[in-house]
Regions:
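Catalytic machinery of carbohydrate-active enzymes
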Residues: 1-350
Length: 350
């Protein structure tokens, strides 16, 4: 059954969310497109993530509104009526995604190996990727084309950006002055750093390096409050764009920034897509698993200390997916460490 002896006619990718994981799908998709240029690709994706990913050419998108609950499953069934695929790549271990996988007609349904097929994912597939342990999420995703017979790995994240998004970014970053983009919030509050610490780094970036500093983020009340707190605490001018951009506009802005400062969040992986180095703040999560794929050396990594302090174990002793989302965990990251890492990063740039 696998690997395929020849290029399949059609492949369906099932990965709904989140934005960072969707970013990891892109090089996997680009690799398959290059190796199998005649293959038809369909991606079942959540509504929010589709706002960026649907810009990828040559892919059919089936968009899922997760707020619709079981109604979303029925909607996918209707959209897929008459579709048959040579393979389904079931790349999400949530039960919601597995219910959607049931609606896909495919000869081969590839899931994770048994050890990683949480939430009974193995019941919804008839093939699996090779068993591996303690690897980055992106590397685990490359196990799927490998199972189909593709040995190549193309680290290509290119997404064509609309002219309007590029103009938005150019208006904010119109010249060669280096820009520090701060995206201060993650999807989980315990991954977030204190506003006054972001402000201290912003002050250093402006005074020591002459940087422009822009805050970015979504429209949630927490993000808006965090942005306002950073602006109040900083004794230098900042541009607060939190809640004011779309995903394509954010990607265009990241492309014009010199550095992104952020905790474990979607923008970390968006920055990787456009080649912008990421100064990642990691205490609650392990950057070796979920950090910026091309900026591991620029992460301030307090995960080991967090494991010892809050779990009383060495990080190597914890299950690979362990998150230490405990109050105070991000306080382990000191301002001085982040400033030192920023200085080192900027010295390394041409």
């Amino acid at each position: 059954m696998l690997p395929f002896a020849e290029a399949p006619r059609s492949v369906c990718i099932l990965r709904l969310s989140a934005i960072g994981d969707a970013c990891h799908i892109v090089p996997v998709l680009r690799t398959m497109q290059q190796v199998w240029p005649a293959t038809r690709f369909t991606w079942i994706i959540a509504k929010t993530e589709s706002r960026l990913m649907r810009l990828i050419e040559g892919v059919e998108f089936i968009i899922v509104d997760k707020r619709a609950g079981l109604g979303a499953v029925a909607a996918v069934r209707r959209q897929l009526a008459g579709h048959t695929f040579d393979a389904l790549l079931h790349m999400q271990v949530a039960l919601r995604a597995s219910l959607i996988a049931l609606q896909v007609s495919a000869a081969v349904k590839v899931g994770f190996d048994r050890a990683r097929a949480r939430e009974l994912q193995w019941l919804f597939t008839n093939a699996h990727i090779a068993a591996r342990s303690r690897e980055h999420v992106l590397d685990s995703f490359f196990g799927f084309p490998a199972a189909l017979g593709i040995k190549e790995r193309l680290l290509r994240w290119d997404i064509p950006l609309p002219h309007a998004a590029q103009e938005y970014a150019r208006a904010l970053v119109p010249d060669a002055q280096p820009t520090l983009l701060i995206s201060p919030c993650s999807s989980h509050v315990q991954r977030n750093w204190r506003p006054e610490r972001y402000a201290a780094v912003a002050e250093h970036a402006v005074r020591r390096h002459g940087m422009r500093v822009i805050l970015s983020g979504g429209p949630s009340l927490l993000e808006q409050a965090t942005g306002a707190a950073i602006v109040r605490a900083a004794r230098v001018p900042l541009m607060n764009q939190i809640g004011r951009d779309t995903l394509p506009e954010l990607l265009a802005l990241l492309a014009r920034a010199a550095v992104l400062l952020s905790p474990d969040s979607g923008p970390v992986h968006m920055a990787t897509m456009v080649g912008t180095p990421v100064l990642g703040l990691y205490g609650a999560t392990n950057p070796a698993r979920s950090g910026p794929y091309l900026s591991q050396q620029w992460c301030v990594n307090a995960y080991g200390e967090a494991a010892r302090r809050f779990r009383h174990r060495e990080p190597e002793e914890l299950p690979w997916t362990t998150k230490i989302e405990t109050p105070g965990v991000m306080d382990l990251i000191q301002v001085e460490e982040v400033i030192a890492k920023l200085d080192e990063l900027l010295r390394s740039r041409p």
